[in-house]
Design a protein with these regions (language model features):
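Short, hydrophobic/proline-enriched secondary-structure or compact coil segments at domain edges
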Residues: 72-76, 104-110, 124, 209-218
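Bacterial N-terminal signal peptides that target proteins for export
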Residues: 2-14
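Short helix-loop boundary/capping segments
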Residues: 129-191
């Protein structure tokens, strides 16, 4: 569930970083040497227009390391215990910073390799600039994980069919779209989803979209699991 999400965003911007699990850094590295890697709790860097975060924000977390060949090709090795509660959301962020009505397009392509075990979701996390509204798009999920809030039915938008949930985590409104079937690659047309929330449901107004994040919301990955973003692009105009 997307609880304490505002906290994880704020914490991901903090420095200095806290070292965590540095001895397992090599386990997270790709076959070829990455241009950047970090096992720090809040480790982050900027690469070709994207900002990468290790972002171990939940309580009871284990070890986690992130590596990157670029902002669009990166991965995570995580060893979090088999306990409840989200441990981390390692992600890549693209800044949009445009009101919805000023956008003519907002799309993303993704291609990931994810484990068959553990408990996690692969998701977009889209924020307004005031961090009052959070839109999550789950493209796949495994294990005992579920969205915050109550079901609002299903809708076909942006190239997929989703079950929609609406809730509040105490800090912000959360609108979660859970894809009807797991997908490891595809294209998401994000703008029609935002317009549906704004125009059809009226859940927010003409907010300014700040961040489009993409990553892995990990609850458990006992023994160490690899999550690889083979390719990610976020484009807006």
């Amino acid at each position: 569930m997307a609880t304490s999400t505002l906290g994880r965003v704020a914490q991901a911007l903090l420095a200095p970083a806290l070292a965590l699990g540095a001895t397992v850094g090599l386990a997270s590295a790709p076959a070829s040497a990455a241009v950047w890697n970090s096992c720090d709790q809040w480790g982050n860097t900027s690469l070709n227009g994207y900002t990468l975060y290790n972002n171990i924000w939940g309580s009871g977390a284990g070890s986690q390391c992130v590596w990157a060949n670029s902002g669009t090709n990166w991965g995570v090795w995580a060893n979090h215990p088999n306990t409840g509660g989200i441990k981390s959301y390692p992600n890549a962020k693209k800044v949009v910073n445009k009101p919805i009505t000023s956008l003519t397009s907002l799309t993303s392509n993704y291609n990931v390799t994810v484990p068959s075990s553990g408990a996690y979701n692969t998701s977009y996390d889209i924020w307004d600039t005031g961090y009052k509204y959070e839109v999550m798009l789950w493209v796949n999920k495994t294990g005992a994980v579920g969205p915050l809030g109550t079901s609002q039915g299903t809708v076909t938008l942006g190239g997929a069919t989703w079950t929609v949930y609406k809730g509040n985590n105490g800090s912000n409104e959360v609108f979660s779209f859970i894809r009807s079937s797991n997908s490891g690659s595809g294209t998401v047309n994000i703008l029609p989803i935002l317009k549906w929330i704004k125009d059809t449901k009226g859940w927010f107004g003409n907010v300014t979209i700040g961040d489009v994040q993409f990553g892995y919301e990990i609850t458990s990955s006992s023994g160490g699991l690899n999550f690889t973003t083979n390719n990610l692009t976020v484009s807006s105009s």
